[in-house]
């Protein structure tokens, strides 16, 4: 009986000792719907960043955990973008710029995801719709915070359409 008590006590101590506190500096992006982003654009012009994901995508989960949970990333997105999380396999209709997009059973994906990526589906994909509502700019693949920084700052600082990306890339100094 004594050894059972010690075993239980040791188990509880182990559980509390191994329990992790949230990592310091971790924050989350405050995601909104596409409709909310569109309404917000009427009040204040900002680019829209869309995280295009699927439920089964492992790299999408890694990007959520490592990139979008990064304090500097989330703070910058909160300040400069309207951030939208969009399931590419979602079945709800989406209205955008006077057009309605629906789930496409032939491709087993949403027509809006096909539109955003120009038909080049890959997950995760970060899509940025610049302020002037030009074509969506799709950046496929997992992006670590240091790689993500240059891309979002190119759009967030208003350089898209003014300066070629390769010129911005040469002048860019990372601060994350």
Segments from the language model and where they lie:
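Bacterial Sec-dependent N-terminal signal peptides
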Residues: 1-24
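Non-globular targeting/processing and membrane-anchoring segments
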Residues: 18-29, 42, 130, 136-176
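A short beta-strand-turn-helix
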Residues: 29-48, 77
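Short active-site neighborhood of thiol/selenol oxidoreductases, capturing the structured segment around
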Residues: 44-58, 83
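Ligand/cofactor pocket segment of small-molecule handling proteins
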Residues: 60, 70
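Detector for the c-type heme attachment site
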Residues: 61-65
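Thioredoxin-like thiol-disulfide oxidoreductase module
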Residues: 71-74, 78-140, 145, 150-157
């Amino acid at each position: 009986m004594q050894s059972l008590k010690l075993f239980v006590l040791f188990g509880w101590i182990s559980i509390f000792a191994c329990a992790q506190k949230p990592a310091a500096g971790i924050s989350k992006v405050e995601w909104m719907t596409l409709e909310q982003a569109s309404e917000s654009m009427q009040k204040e012009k900002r680019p829209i960043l869309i995280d295009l994901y699927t439920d089964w995508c492992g790299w999408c989960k890694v990007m959520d955990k490592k990139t979008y949970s990064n304090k500097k990333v989330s703070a910058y997105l909160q300040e400069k973008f309207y951030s939208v999380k969009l399931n590419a396999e979602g079945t709800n209709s989406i209205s955008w710029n006077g057009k309605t997009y629906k789930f496409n059973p032939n491709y087993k994906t949403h027509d809006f995801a096909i539109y955003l990526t120009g038909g080049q589906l890959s997950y995760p994909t970060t899509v940025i719709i610049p302020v002037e509502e030009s074509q969506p700019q799709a950046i496929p693949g997992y992006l670590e915070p240091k790689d993500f920084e240059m891309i979002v700052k190119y759009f967030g600082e208003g350089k898209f359409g003014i300066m070629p990306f390769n010129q911005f890339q040469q002048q860019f100094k990372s601060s994350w």
